[in-house]
Protein backbone atom coordinates (compact mmCIF):
# COMPACT_ATOMS: atom_id res chain seq x y z
CA UNK A 1 0.00 0.00 0.00
CA UNK A 2 1.89 3.03 -1.23
CA UNK A 3 -0.79 5.66 -0.73
CA UNK A 4 -2.37 7.77 2.00
CA UNK A 5 -5.79 9.40 2.30
CA UNK A 6 -6.84 13.05 2.15
CA UNK A 7 -10.15 14.86 1.86
CA UNK A 8 -10.94 16.59 -1.42
CA UNK A 9 -11.09 20.01 0.28
CA UNK A 10 -7.43 19.58 1.42
CA UNK A 11 -6.11 19.10 -2.14
CA UNK A 12 -4.33 21.87 -4.05
CA UNK A 13 -2.96 22.41 -7.55
CA UNK A 14 0.42 20.71 -7.93
CA UNK A 15 -0.30 17.91 -5.43
CA UNK A 16 -0.92 14.31 -6.46
CA UNK A 17 -4.00 12.06 -6.44
CA UNK A 18 -4.77 8.49 -7.50
CA UNK A 19 -7.37 8.33 -10.27
CA UNK A 20 -8.15 4.81 -11.53
CA UNK A 21 -5.05 3.54 -9.65
CA UNK A 22 -2.86 5.90 -11.68
CA UNK A 23 -0.81 8.64 -9.93
CA UNK A 24 -1.80 12.05 -11.34
CA UNK A 25 -0.65 15.65 -10.74
CA UNK A 26 -3.54 18.06 -10.11
CA UNK A 27 -3.60 20.90 -12.66
CA UNK A 28 -7.00 22.38 -11.77
CA UNK A 29 -9.40 22.04 -8.87
CA UNK A 30 -12.67 23.92 -8.43
CA UNK A 31 -15.09 23.75 -5.51
CA UNK A 32 -18.80 24.37 -5.95
CA UNK A 33 -21.03 25.79 -3.24
CA UNK A 34 -23.43 23.51 -1.37
CA UNK A 35 -26.79 23.46 -3.07
CA UNK A 36 -30.39 22.87 -2.15
CA UNK A 37 -30.08 19.11 -2.61
CA UNK A 38 -26.56 18.25 -1.56
CA UNK A 39 -23.17 19.19 -0.27
CA UNK A 40 -20.37 21.03 -2.04
CA UNK A 41 -18.51 19.20 -4.79
CA UNK A 42 -14.91 19.40 -5.96
CA UNK A 43 -14.02 18.98 -9.64
CA UNK A 44 -10.45 17.78 -10.12
CA UNK A 45 -8.54 17.84 -13.42
CA UNK A 46 -5.22 16.00 -13.34
CA UNK A 47 -2.49 14.74 -15.69
CA UNK A 48 -1.12 11.21 -15.25
CA UNK A 49 2.49 11.07 -14.04
CA UNK A 50 3.34 7.93 -16.02
CA UNK A 51 0.91 8.07 -18.97
CA UNK A 52 0.51 11.88 -19.46
CA UNK A 53 -3.25 11.37 -19.92
CA UNK A 54 -5.80 13.93 -18.73
CA UNK A 55 -8.15 12.64 -16.02
CA UNK A 56 -11.19 14.40 -14.57
CA UNK A 57 -13.28 13.44 -11.52
CA UNK A 58 -15.96 15.00 -9.31
CA UNK A 59 -16.26 14.17 -5.61
CA UNK A 60 -18.02 15.67 -2.57
CA UNK A 61 -15.54 17.87 -0.66
CA UNK A 62 -15.69 15.60 2.41
CA UNK A 63 -14.90 12.50 0.33
CA UNK A 64 -11.59 10.80 1.14
CA UNK A 65 -9.36 10.19 -1.89
CA UNK A 66 -6.12 8.26 -2.23
CA UNK A 67 -2.89 10.27 -2.47
CA UNK A 68 0.10 8.32 -3.84
CA UNK A 69 3.40 8.17 -1.99
CA UNK A 70 5.95 9.13 -4.67
CA UNK A 71 9.56 8.22 -3.96
CA UNK A 72 12.14 10.40 -5.71
CA UNK A 73 15.54 8.74 -6.20
CA UNK A 74 18.66 8.93 -8.36
CA UNK A 75 20.16 6.24 -10.57
CA UNK A 76 23.13 5.80 -12.88
CA UNK A 77 22.52 4.96 -16.54
CA UNK A 78 24.22 1.65 -17.39
CA UNK A 79 23.09 1.14 -20.99
CA UNK A 80 20.59 2.30 -23.61
CA UNK A 81 18.92 -0.07 -26.11
CA UNK A 82 15.65 -0.11 -28.07
CA UNK A 83 14.02 2.86 -26.29
CA UNK A 84 14.82 1.29 -22.92
CA UNK A 85 17.35 2.44 -20.35
CA UNK A 86 19.03 0.13 -17.86
CA UNK A 87 19.58 1.92 -14.54
CA UNK A 88 21.30 1.16 -11.25
CA UNK A 89 19.87 2.77 -8.12
CA UNK A 90 22.45 4.98 -6.37
CA UNK A 91 21.49 3.82 -2.87
CA UNK A 92 20.49 0.16 -3.16
CA UNK A 93 22.54 -0.72 -6.30
CA UNK A 94 19.47 -2.50 -7.70
CA UNK A 95 19.42 -2.66 -11.52
CA UNK A 96 16.23 -2.29 -13.54
CA UNK A 97 15.01 -1.32 -17.01
CA UNK A 98 12.71 1.64 -17.74
CA UNK A 99 11.12 2.40 -21.14
CA UNK A 100 11.89 5.96 -22.28
CA UNK A 101 10.27 8.33 -24.76
CA UNK A 102 12.41 8.48 -27.96
CA UNK A 103 12.62 12.29 -27.64
CA UNK A 104 14.29 11.93 -24.22
CA UNK A 105 16.85 9.36 -25.41
CA UNK A 106 19.04 12.14 -26.88
CA UNK A 107 19.42 13.71 -23.41
CA UNK A 108 20.50 10.46 -21.72
CA UNK A 109 24.06 9.14 -21.93
CA UNK A 110 25.59 6.03 -20.30
CA UNK A 111 27.32 6.83 -17.01
CA UNK A 112 25.24 9.90 -16.15
CA UNK A 113 23.05 10.26 -13.04
CA UNK A 114 19.33 10.71 -13.67
CA UNK A 115 16.46 11.31 -11.24
CA UNK A 116 13.56 8.87 -11.32
CA UNK A 117 10.23 8.62 -9.55
CA UNK A 118 8.66 5.47 -8.18
CA UNK A 119 4.96 5.14 -7.29
CA UNK A 120 2.40 2.34 -7.30
CA UNK A 121 4.94 -0.17 -8.64
CA UNK A 122 5.88 2.01 -11.64
CA UNK A 123 9.03 3.98 -12.38
CA UNK A 124 9.76 6.92 -14.67
CA UNK A 125 12.87 8.97 -15.45
CA UNK A 126 12.16 12.64 -14.69
CA UNK A 127 14.50 14.75 -16.81
CA UNK A 128 14.77 18.53 -16.47
CA UNK A 129 13.23 20.31 -19.47
UniProtKB/Swiss-Prot annotation:
The keyword rRNA processing does not apply. GO terms for biological process: positive regulation of translational elongation; positive regulation of translational termination. The keyword Methyltransferase does not apply. InterPro entries: IF5A-like (IPR001884), IF5A-like_N (IPR048670), NA-bd_OB-fold (IPR012340), Rib_uL2_dom2 (IPR014722), Trans_elong_IF5A_hypusine_site (IPR019769), Transl_elong_IF5A_arc (IPR022847), Transl_elong_IF5A_C (IPR020189), Translation_prot_SH3-like_sf (IPR008991). It is found in: Cytoplasm. GO terms for molecular function: ribosome binding; RNA binding; translation elongation factor activity; translation initiation factor activity. GO terms for cellular component: cytoplasm. It comes from the Archaea. Belongs to the eIF-5A family. This is Translation initiation factor 5A. The lineage of its organism: Archaea, Methanobacteriati, Thermoplasmatota, Thermoplasmata, Thermoplasmatales. The gene is eif5a.
Amino acid sequence: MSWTEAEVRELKVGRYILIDDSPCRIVDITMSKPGKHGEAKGRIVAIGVFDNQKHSVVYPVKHKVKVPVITKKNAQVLSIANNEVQLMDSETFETFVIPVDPADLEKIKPGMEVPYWEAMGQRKIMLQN
